[in-house]
Amino acid sequence: MDKKLLFIVNPRAGKTKSSAPLFEAVSIYSEAGYLVSVRQTRGRGDATVLAETLGADCDLIVCHGGDGTLNETINGVMRIPKEKRPMVS
């Protein structure tokens, strides 16, 4: 059975707007046996909601964004019961 990975992406973070690095990362994780799901944030607080609502069913959450996106992702993960919390990268 594949491991599940949630990619939380803030498309507004960073200076480059290219999606090439994201596609490359998704490909690498897929080849490593992960079933990858990509979700984009649209506004403040979205990463928290995504991590909390979708993270408990995942083995790993990868945060692709800036400090704020990472902070929100961690906040969402910490709302998941300890025994169901995924790793965060």
Name each model feature, range by range:
Residues D2-S89:
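Small-residue-rich beta-alpha loop regions that form the catalytic core of phosphotransfer
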